[in-house]
């Protein structure tokens, strides 16, 4: 079921605010308990709603079946031995700035000696963040194109002859979708992008078959989008297959023209590549 978009008030927190609000492990555990109880808590065993908090065990006890449910049960933190405060700090570091941050830097910031548990924590957080964003379908006017990111050649393909262009072993293919519409008032700056951007989705694809691309677009949109693409053959049947309410194709060899008609997908691809190069030495 698709998650409906909601307008929420976000409290911007800086580093000093974070340490003031969460000075120790006890404050983080209390915040997690209040959050879970506020957003609805039920017994994982019988579904009962009558739960009693046991501070000495840091768990709830179901009044109906007597099942004991730990503070982290059913959350992304379940099974982790890292303190709740480390999880809160990682969430803050991942979302507090526009620039990406590496797991190695998060490890340094929270003062952990071992890399593996920090990597697992960050991987879980990024996974659930992606799933949450994946629940919001794109709609309205939309641009679609593919991006190619330089990555290491997979081990099983290192002895194979290198391909060129689409399908190269040294490139990972990503389908980029961006809500893009003409603003009510024209941009003030002469060289500003002529369209305004909304939400964006990027998904790794294994091949460029029409069925693969159609499936990814169908998963990421509400089915009523007005899609604009280049002349790649895999996009031809989008409207016919009910993936888009209308489909506009731009066929041109002039890169400047494509940049004007499909500006935001190219900006997104460029920014993503720059972010990866600024944050990581290499990616697989």
Task: Indicate where each model-derived feature is located.
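Residue-level recognition of single "structural anchor" positions
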Residues: 2-284
